[in-house]
Structures are given as C-alpha cells and as structure tokens.
Amino acid sequence: MKPQMHLAIDVSWTQVETIWREPGARVNRHYPDVGLFEDIARVAERGLLDLIFFGDSTGIPNTWKNSIDDAVRYGVAWPRLDMSPWITAMSRVTKHVGFGLTYATTFMHPFYVARLLNSLDHITNGRIAFNVITSQRKADAQNYGFDELMEHGQRYDRMDEFMDVCQALWRSVEPDAFEWDRATGRVANPDKVRAINHVGRFFKVKGPLSVPPSPQVVPVLIQAGGSPRGTRTAARFVDHVFGARKPIPAMSKQRAEIDAALLAEGRDPSKVGVIWSTQVMVGETEAEAKRMRERLIDGVPREAVGAWLSHNTGFDMSTLPPRFTLRELNERIVAANASPVGFVAQLAQALGDDGEITLDEFMEHGLRTATSYATTVAGTAAQIADDLEERFEGSGSRGGFMLRHSQCEQIDMLHNIVDLLVPELQRRGRFRTAYSGRTLRENLAT
C-alpha cells in the first residue's frame, strides 16, 4: 500500500487575494456569515479532509507607512474573527473533520489557552489542533500593551515556557479522576487532580486546570517556525510542522533538519509529519485554472502588497530606496527587530545577497508571494495530483498538504478540490476513502 497524504484547507481570510471579487464568492456586505463557515465544513468533510485551519492576527496591519489606511482600504489581514466560537457552529454540522486554531504565545496566557482548547476539544469530540506561533507583528503587540516586540530569541523562550505550562495543565487532571458516585457524593478523586506549581521566567501558574480531560487530552500541536531556533522549539512538542512550498530539494532538506532536531530531543521522526502549504487552483482545464490565477494577480493593488509584506515582516517596506541589495534589506529588517519572510530568502537564493533589485521588481515578487500566487499550481486535477505526489515522495512521504485559502472563500472552488482533486488522489491510492479515526489525532496519525 502506498503512503497516503493528509489534506487540510486554510481558511485564514486575508482578502488580499481579491477572490472575494469573483462571481460566486460569498464574502460580501453580509460578512461574517455563519452559514458560509458551516458550508465550508460540510464540503470539507464530504471530501474526507483532515483539517480546516484558521491563521490569526489581532491587530490591523499598521507597519506600512505607519498607518492602517491601506490595510483597511483593501482588506489586508482584516477583518479577522476569533474563530473559537465559530468552530462550535461548524462542529455541529460535521462529525470527523478537524479544526485548527492559532494563538500567539508572545501575548496570550497559557492557562487561558489551555482551558479554551480543552473546552473546544470537548465540544468537537476530539477534533481540535493548536497552531503555536510567536508574533513578529507590531500591530498585535500594541493591542496587548506593548510598544515594541520582544527580541526574536526571547519570543521563542516564551513559547518554550508557554508550552511547558500548557502541557502540564492538560495532564493535571487524570483521565479517571472523575467518579460521579451517587452513593458517596464523590465527584472526583482529589489524589488525581494536582497543582502544577509552575514558576518561570514569564509565567507563574499554580493549576490544576479547572476542566475535565478532553477526548484528545492534548490537542494536536502544530508549529511553523522555519528558523533554526523555531525548528528546535518545534521539535520539543509538535505533532506536525507547517512548511512552506519550495523546490523539492529544499523541502527534502527542511525535512532532514526537522528529523535531526527531533532526534536531538529523543523523539521518533516517523511520528511527526510535515504539512506543506500549497496554493492550488483546480480547473476542468489547465487554461481555465491559469486564467483565474492571472486574473486574480492583476486585481491586487500595490499598496495592499506593501501593507501585507510590511505586516508579515514587521518592517515598513515603504521606506526602501529605489534600488537596494537583499543584504541591505535583511540588515534593515533585523535592525527593526523584525523577521525576514520566506520570499526574501528565496530572492537572495536567486539573486545572491549582493544582487541589486529595484523597488518595483521587489514589489512584483512580493505581489506573487503575498497572494501565494508565485507557487500556485494551476491546472487540472490530474496535473495537481502529479505535483502533490511528486512533492510528497520527494519530502519523505510523511505528512501532506495544506491547500491555501483562496480556494475556500468561493464554495464552487472548494467543490473543485473535493469533487475533482480528491477522487484523483484516491484513484492513485494517495488519499483515504473513509475516515478511520475517532479523533483528529487518530486521523492525522502518520
């Protein structure tokens, strides 16, 4: 039997992709619409997908030109909902598909997040995943009482401690602690409910968690840090790593780096998958899919690209000179206590650190990256399945793909994934024909 891949869909509304302007899209004056999210969940489950994923940020992007104006004008990373209550609605119309929530350990408190995710795991009968992130976004920091972001390494130190606290809390009540003995009146055995008494650099938490253990006990844990420090931190606790689509040798190299970090932590690499983020446009014909891709690219305003890239790096791209090298750009980003994003590294790989680029050229590269269209696979179901299968094998056949969100804002396009791509992968023996697990963790077992 061939190794099978997992499939997730990313429904992290950003609007910068402009697909909301296409005929049939349901993001409109009535947004948000709970019916849209329920329909997405129904279609995803009909396609036997593993996970519906929600990225998050809590501040309106304000790094570009030191203003929120272009982000508001063009819908860049806003509006964004707290998806936790919406997941309850989606879970009521499904039984198997999982839900991934994102919280930044840079600002949140572990007791709150541990309790919330435990409660949602109960509501969904064991279908919750936690995407653990740091934040490099000043707009987020400013909504949590910080004028500036903490230093990069410190953000990961805080994440390490945050996850230590969460995992201790999730295990602070034993699965058999509850008795519900009518004769004695005993609800639970106090010997099986223990304080964690955590005192650390960032948090002081007595515990225990004030809720019963959930079906998964610990939600499925996901992390996307691509830096060496991010990889080391992820290796301590993750079940799956999010990776960005790149050339197959680079995917294989990243998989090897993750495996080495897992081994250094005494963990079995075969138990941890990589979910590669991949934008696909499935059409009845290749020409139809490619026309859609080009039409969407043409609809994105330059100011929206600048706002998105500045938000994601924490560096104001509007301050760049007309010409610069990638080395100079990286120096500016680091000096601003910001974080280079993947496409800067990709450009450096293509041009060299000292290769000069004009601002217009940079923004054109940024356009295709901010919208994910630089790496979009546009074609028929068979063509996309060829690509996914090649990448799956080339990166170790452990994990799968997260199909990016522009497909999902338009239900008809999500139908193309479920009705065209999924059957093609099933014919090749690369995707399940039925859910086999009771919980998300069981369905995601690699």
Model-flagged regions — what are they?
Residues M1-K2, E45-R46, T88-K95, D121-R127, ...:
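Acidic (Asp/Glu)-rich catalytic clusters
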Residues M1-Q15, G153-Q216, P249-A256, A260-F392, ...:
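An alpha-helical appendage that flanks or caps ligand/catalytic pockets
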Residues M1-V93, Q216-P219, R332:
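N-terminal beta1-alpha1-beta2 module of alpha/beta enzyme domains
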Residues M5-I9, I52-F54, V97-Y103, G126-V132, ...:
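Hydrophobic faces of well-ordered beta-strands that scaffold small-molecule active sites
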Residues L7, A44, L48, M90, ...:
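Conserved, mostly hydrophobic/aromatic
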Residues A8, S12, R26-G35, I87-G98, ...:
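Hydrophobic, small-residue-rich alpha-helical packing segments that form membrane-like cores
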Residues Y31-A44, Q223-T233, T380-G394:
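Short, acidic/polar
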Residues G230-P247:
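A conserved active-site cap/scaffold subdomain adjacent to cofactor or substrate pockets
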